[in-house]
């Protein structure tokens, strides 16, 4: 089976050097997902040759960096002969257009003694007797012929990919992963921009919390382009005991700040260059503009919040698409540790609390459980 893979449009806009790098990473990710076969680059697309019974082909729809892909039939050399293309088109498409209203779409790369319009017209005439008619604007079925120099490719399916950039081209980011609805979606969005997530989870709910986090990450692993996901599980109950020493109104923001501080240490350890969270502006009390400012104050790495402008319905819709929603919805809210959380905490108070708590963030990270998924 031969498959033509069309990379995301933005990859084509990169400089030649960056484009080669992105396409090389995409090819490696595809190899990791498909497990076998031959892959090569040619004139802005990738070709993948695999066994006909390969069951991993559908996984291409979850490989970031792919705009679309199509299983194709081909004539490897037709000597600039349009008649060969017409005959092959009848062989491939006669059953596809049978009893249906159809259209032919053709495009060419290279020099030929015929135009793309010639191909569409002649192939359309040859297929017409098998069909119920032609409609270029609203066909029941479309058939495609793509001519690249001395090879013609025939296909009738265009399967959409997730677009974005190949996972790995943007380096690593440490993701604060609660396991609720938001953090898996934020992780997915960072992978879509080419980042490899390093997962940091503060376990506040014991074995139940751990179970659902692992299930969510198993879903996200299918979108990772073959990259393994490394999970660091911190014992969050020890942190909560510490936080009981400060005023209730500051505890939620202080907990988030502890998470940021541990994430900062993990960035150092994992050679990650950013921290990612699932925070959305003004969604809850800890996510007001003021509280986000206090939470990230003094953190040396950039904080990415891919959901910052999303409302809850939009986030839920994405979670359903990704496949994590069914697990996230079963997980209790563990970060709601205070019913008196303020929407505007004082930076001076939080910094004083932080000094008094004197948490050893390095030790918190050292005592974490590490799992590779």
Curated annotation (Swiss-Prot):
Functional pathway: Cofactor biosynthesis; thiamine diphosphate biosynthesis
Alphabetical UniProt keywords: ATP-binding, Cytoplasm, Nucleotide-binding, RNA-binding, Thiamine biosynthesis, Transferase, tRNA-binding
Signal peptide annotation: none
- State if Electron transport is listed as a keyword: no
- Give the Pfam families listed for this entry: ThiI, ThiI_fer, THUMP
Residue stretches making up the THUMP domain: 54-158
List the subcellular locations: Cytoplasm
Residues recorded as binding ATP, renumbered to this chain, are: 176-177, 201-202, 256, 278, 287
- E.C. no: 2.8.1.4
Q: Which Gene3D superfamilies match?
A: 3.30.2130.30, HUPs
Q: Which SMART domains match?
A: THUMP
Q: Which PROSITE patterns match?
A: THUMP (PS51165)
Catalyzed chemical reaction(s) = [ThiI sulfur-carrier protein]-S-sulfanyl-L-cysteine + a uridine in tRNA + 2 reduced [2Fe-2S]-[ferredoxin] + ATP + H(+) = [ThiI sulfur-carrier protein]-L-cysteine + a 4-thiouridine in tRNA + 2 oxidized [2Fe-2S]-[ferredoxin] + AMP + diphosphate; [ThiS sulfur-carrier protein]-C-terminal Gly-Gly-AMP + S-sulfanyl-L-cysteinyl-[cysteine desulfurase] + AH2 = [ThiS sulfur-carrier protein]-C-terminal-Gly-aminoethanethioate + L-cysteinyl-[cysteine desulfurase] + A + AMP + 2 H(+)
One GO BP annotation is: thiamine biosynthetic process
**Gene Ontology CC: one annotated term:** cytosol
Q: Which GO terms describe its molecular function?
A: ATP binding; CCA tRNA nucleotidyltransferase activity; tRNA binding; tRNA-uracil-4 sulfurtransferase activity
What family is this? Belongs to the ThiI family.
Q: What does this protein do?
A: Catalyzes the ATP-dependent transfer of a sulfur to tRNA to produce 4-thiouridine in position 8 of tRNAs, which functions as a near-UV photosensor. Also catalyzes the transfer of sulfur to the sulfur carrier protein ThiS, forming ThiS-thiocarboxylate. This is a step in the synthesis of thiazole, in the thiamine biosynthesis pathway. The sulfur is donated as persulfide by IscS.
Q: Which HAMAP family match?
A: ThiI
Name of this chain's protein? Probable tRNA sulfurtransferase
Quote the gene name from the UniProt entry.
thiI
